[in-house]
Regions:
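A short aromatic-anchored loop/beta-hairpin motif
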Residues: 26-194
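Bacterial N-terminal signal peptides
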Residues: 8-21
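N-terminal secretory signal peptides that target proteins for export/translocation
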Residues: 1-5
C-alpha cells in the first residue's frame, strides 16, 4: 500500500505543479486586456490593494486605469462649464500617475460609433483626448466612468512586474472594470484561483 500512496502523492504534486505552470503561462499572455490585482509585495506602496485594467498598445507596452480608487471629486468640479457634468453622481477615479491632470472616460461603447475612441477590449472603449471626453460628457455623461490620469508601461515592463510578483493576473471583463461599488474589489479578487 505504501508504494501506491507515494505514487498517488507524486501524481498529486505533479498536478499541482502543472496547474501552477499553466496559470503562470496564462498570466503572462498579455496580448489581450487583463485585470491586474496588486500582490502583497506592493503593501505600503501607492499601488497597495489596487485593481487595474491593463490593455495592450498597438506599438507595444500597455495602458491601464486603476478601477478601485474613487475620489471625493465630482465631475462637475472638473468641468463646471458643462451643465451635463452636474448630472453625474459618480465620483471621478484616480486612473494612475501618468498624465495626472488629464481626464479620460471609459465606457462600454462609443456614443455615435465615433472613431475617436481607443478600444481597450471587447465591450470597453476609452476617450483619451479632451474634445472626445467633452463629447461624452455632453451626449452620454452617465454612460462613462471618468478617470484622472492613467497607467502606462513600456514594452516588456508589465511582463517584468508580473514575473517579479507585483501583480496577480485575471481575465478582464467590463463588469469588473465598471463595477458600481468598487470597495472590496481587491479583496474579492486577491488570491482568487483562475
Amino acid at each position: 500500500m505504501q508504494p501506491f500512496l507515494r505514487a498517488l502523492q507524486s501524481l498529486g504534486a505533479l498536478l499541482v505543479l502543472f496547474a501552477g505552470m499553466t496559470g503562470a503561462a496564462r498570466a503572462l499572455d498579455l496580448s489581450q486586456a487583463v485585470i491586474l490585482v496588486a500582490s502583497s509585495s506592493l503593501a505600503g506602496s501607492i499601488y497597495e490593494q489596487t485593481v487595474i485594467l491593463a490593455a495592450p498598445l498597438p506599438q507595444g507596452g500597455h495602458v491601464g486605469f486603476i478601477v478601485n480608487r474613487p475620489t471625493s471629486v465630482k465631475l462637475e468640479t472638473l468641468f463646471p462649464e458643462q451643465a451635463a457634468a452636474r448630472n453625474v453622481a459618480a465620483p471621478v477615479y484616480v486612473g494612475g500617475p501618468v498624465l495626472s491632470r488629464a481626464v479620460f472616460a471609459v465606457m462600454r461603447k462609443a456614443p455615435d460609433n465615433s472613431a475617436d475612441f481607443v478600444s481597450l477590449m471587447p465591450g470597453l472603449v476609452a476617450a483619451v483626448d479632451g474634445s472626445t471626453v467633452d463629447r461624452v460628457i455632453e451626449k452620454s455623461p452617465n454612460d462613462a466612468r471618468y478617470f484622472v490620469g492613467l497607467m502606462l508601461w513600456a514594452p516588456d515592463e508589465l511582463d517584468d512586474e508580473i514575473r517579479n510578483g507585483a501583480w496577480e493576473v485575471r481575465p478582464a471583463d467590463a463588469d469588473t472594470v465598471l463595477r458600481a461599488n468598487p470597495s472590496g474589489l481587491w479583496k474579492s479578487l486577491e488570491g482568487e484561483i483562475v
